Structure formats: structure tokens, C-alpha cells
């Protein structure tokens, strides 16, 4: 009988793992968030948000590294939460993670749609705020239709689009540095470092935006079974990729700040285009705008495809609604899961960009990030004999830093975003009680 390989090859070393992680982290984010982060703190001091965000990401990265090496395999957060809380409410924790993901995932995709259309308004200035929302909604509908028609063009050139994005980031940095004005780049407002409520509130908002841009620092944990010496490589890959991406984004911020007054940046909805317009002229600004739109759409298309797989996988494993595990009979993809994520994305596209970003992160914090931090402590307490190839350095200090950091971000996200996240979670608990009762009773469709 032919021997079948039942495990993945561990071929990713530190350099490959770091590059892979950075590849998933670098994206459209800074092109749409630089005005928001500058506005949050009122000047170049917004760089502090990047520094605090990097510290939180590195600390939380150790939580992910320990969980992924002690609970290897597919599933990610919903497996970590299920196992960590299994003595208490593991199934509920896993369900709530998928439930909150049905909100946070579409919000993240919607931020790309809205940001992309805002850049289009540089080419077509007649697009007002209402038009932008309607057009972003229409782009969402168009993307669902593309998925249903199994258009593979965007998926086939994902790597190419990512390279174009890197080139776009690189060109933006290069143009900024070659037109550098120190006075503009470091024009701090009077009394900017006064420890006041305004400073703390602004730092919280800036850190939230920085964390939105750094999301993905944990993606290498999903490839743990393909990493050489994961106990060594995974935590170091997270740290190196966070530092690397933070430096890229910080230099990009400084490059743009050096060419435009920060007050003008804070008001812009297509800041990179405005920078090119001022330094190289409208012709080159339009070319950059088109590059940003193309790469933004490529990334959001891929996100909708990949994010629709998580509810599908959870449903197939029996931890979510059974109907989300249905596969299209002819085109062979999880169409109900895709429709759900797609429709939620279209609705989310009708809101303001700053609210979308705040809600996309705040809705994940309670269950996923804080839940995993507490869950790691519970696993150590309840299963001390479990094999842990990687153990958090200086435990529990990174856990404490990450917990305080995410709590700070959550409280800084604004009452509207907090309210949406909390209400969505409460609704999820009520639906779970009903679903779990039907599921255990064997009712079809549960």
C-alpha cells in the first residue's frame, strides 16, 4: 500500500517566516489612515501611536506564539478559545469568536472599499460623501457577483498586486524623502506632550489606527506546522515583522509630513495623491491614484474570499450554523458564507471610514484578543503538563502589557464603536443559547 504523507513539510526558516508575515501585513492601510492618525493627535506626534502599537503587537505576538505552538494545526483563534475555556464555556467562546468575526471581517473589507472610492474622488472631484458611500456599496455588490462568476483573475495575480503595492509604498517614501522639508515633518504643536485627557485620548485613537494597520502580525501562527523549529522562529518572526512594518509605515508618515502641512494632511481623503499632486503634478498623482485603487481592490477581493472560509470551516466542524457550511452545487465554493460576509460588507460600506476602522478593531478585542490573553493563563493553570514548545518570555509581563494595551484601545474607540461591539456580542450570546439548544436536539439547519 502506498504511504500517504500526513504532515506538512517544515520548510520555513526565520527569514522566510518573517517575509511571509510582512507580506500579509503590508497593504492599503497607511494610504487611508495617515490622515486619521495625524488628526487623532494633532500633528507629527502621532508617531507615538506607531510606537505604542508596536509594543502591544510584539507583546500580544508572544500570546499567539505560545498558543499556536501548544495547540498546533488549523483553526486558529476559535480552537485556542475552545480549548482554553473548555472547562467553563469553550463552545460558547468559539461560537462568539466566529460571531464577532462576522462583524469585524466585513468591517475590515469595507474600510478598503471606502478608502478606495475616496481615492477615486481625487480623479472625479464631483464624488461627495453620499456618492462615496453609494459607490462603495456598489463595489461590494460587484465583488460578490465576481465571486459567484468564479472570476479568478484577481486571485491569480495576488502576488503581483502585492508587489505593486510595495512599489507604490516605496515610490511614496522616495518622493517624500526627495522633497523633504524638516520644518514640516517635525512641526509639533505647542504643549503637545502635556499629560492631559486630550493627549491620552488622542494617543488611544492613534494607537487604535496603528494597530489596524499592523493587523496580521499573528498570521505566521497559522503556518506553524510549516515552520522549522517553531518555538524559535515564530516569536522572532512576529517581532521582526512588527518592527519592520512599523518602520516602513513610520517612514511613510514622515515622508508625507515633510511635503505637506499636517493640518492639510488631516483633512485629506486621498493623502498620497495630494502629495504627488503638490510635488510632481496632477499627471503623476493620477497614476499613483490608479495604482492605489487597483491594489486596494485586489486585496479586498482576496479578503472577501478568504474571510468567507472561516464561518464555513467552523460550520463544517459543528461550531457554527450548519447552513453556512453549504457548498455551491455547481461552482463548488461556500456560497452562503460568502453571501453573508459580502452582504455585511456592503452594509458596513455605508458608514464613515473612521467609524468602520474603530468598530472593526473594537469588535474583536473583547472575545479574540483579551479572550486569548486570559485563555493562555487558564491553559497554564489547568493544563500545566501540556507540551509548550515555546513559552512566553518574561511571563506574564507581555500578557499584562497586551491586556492593558488592548483595553486602552477598546476604551479609546468611541462609544459608538464600543456600543456596536458590546451589543453584537450580547446578541451573539442570546443566539448561541437558542442555536445550541437546537443543535443538541438535532434540529435541521442549526
Give the label of every model feature segment.
Residues 79-86, 122-126, 207, 239-304, ...:
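TM-loop-TM module centered on a large, flexible mid-protein loop between adjacent transmembrane helices
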Residues 11-21, 47, 55, 88-103, ...:
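Select transmembrane alpha-helical segments in multipass membrane proteins
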Residues 117, 131-183, 197, 215, ...:
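Membrane-interface loop-to-helix entry segments
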Residues 1-44, 58, 62-65, 190-191, ...:
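Membrane-interface "cap" regions at the ends of multi-pass membrane proteins
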Residues 168-172, 311, 361-388, 424-442:
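Hydrophobic alpha-helical segments of multi-pass membrane transport proteins
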Residues 36, 49, 58-140, 145-148, ...:
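Hydrophobic transmembrane alpha-helices that form the core helical bundles
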Residues 323-333, 369-418, 438-446:
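C-terminal membrane-solvent junction of multi-pass transporters and transport-like membrane proteins
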Residues 3-9, 47, 127-131, 160-289:
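Helix-loop-helix junctions that connect adjacent transmembrane segments
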